[in-house]
């Protein structure tokens, strides 16, 4: 766990060239399906990076906190390093997997959302502490990464509670091939209103 301190179709090369390769943040609460979705994307030809590996490679991560098992990341330092390192676009479409990925210098953000009750079941099955389960449920309930929305890059979200990883990947591919259409916070899923919103 990381914490902040302060269809497998291939892309059409022609279409990819038109859109341009990007690094895309794949964010969402713990248990929302990020790593599973990332693995399906990897099998379909995407490059996959993780926030944890990037932080480790760039000496931006602390030792594990014995209280909750989290490894605090200096996300400000990491972002500063990557702004320079990522000045050029990647050679392949790249996914940056991690719930802090939307805070890095990515070219778009994919937010995975999950019904809080289903998310609770997933987290409890992992034997997480009550405090860790509750904090992740709260983060999902209030909108998760949308609270740190950056209007300068395209954002979109997908609901993973009832949709299979393969179907979600299909939607992600469609979003990319359709030109990264930009969602806005007011279209996001609102669990308080019963999960309404444009998915």
Please place each PLM-identified region on the residue numbering.
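ATP-binding Walker
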Residues: 32
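NTP-dependent small-molecule kinase module
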Residues: 125, 150-199
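A glycine- and Lys/Arg-enriched "phosphate-lid" helix/loop adjacent to the NTP-binding pocket
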Residues: 63, 114-156
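Walker A/P-loop
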Residues: 35
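Hydrophobic anchor at the beta1->P-loop junction of P-loop NTPases
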Residues: 26
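P-loop (Walker A) phosphate-binding loop of NTP-binding proteins
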Residues: 29
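ATP-dependent small-molecule kinase phosphotransfer cores
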Residues: 47-104, 195-197
């Amino acid at each position: 766990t990381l914490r902040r301190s302060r269809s497998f179709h291939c892309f059409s090369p022609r279409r990819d060239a038109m859109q341009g390769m990007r690094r895309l943040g794949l964010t969402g609460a713990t248990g929302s399906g990020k790593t599973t979705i990332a693995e399906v994307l990897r099998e379909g030809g995407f490059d996959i990076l993780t926030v944890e590996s990037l932080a480790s490679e760039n000496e931006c991560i602390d030792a594990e906190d014995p209280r909750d098992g989290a490894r605090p990341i200096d996300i400000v330092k990491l972002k500063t390093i990557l702004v320079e390192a990522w000045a050029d676009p990647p050679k392949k479409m790249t996914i940056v997997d991690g719930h802090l990925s939307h805070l890095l210098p990515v070219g778009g953000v994919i937010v995975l959302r999950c019904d809080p009750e289903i998310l609770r079941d997933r987290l409890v099955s992992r034997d997480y502490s009550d405090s860790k389960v509750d904090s992740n449920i709260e983060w999902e309930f209030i909108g998760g990464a949308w609270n740190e929305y950056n209007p300068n890059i395209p954002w979109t979200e997908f609901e993973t509670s009832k949709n299979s990883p393969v179907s979600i990947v299909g939607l992600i591919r469609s979003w990319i091939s359709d030109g990264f259409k930009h969602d806005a916070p007011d279209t996001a899923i609102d669990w308080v209103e019963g999960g309404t919103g444009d998915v």
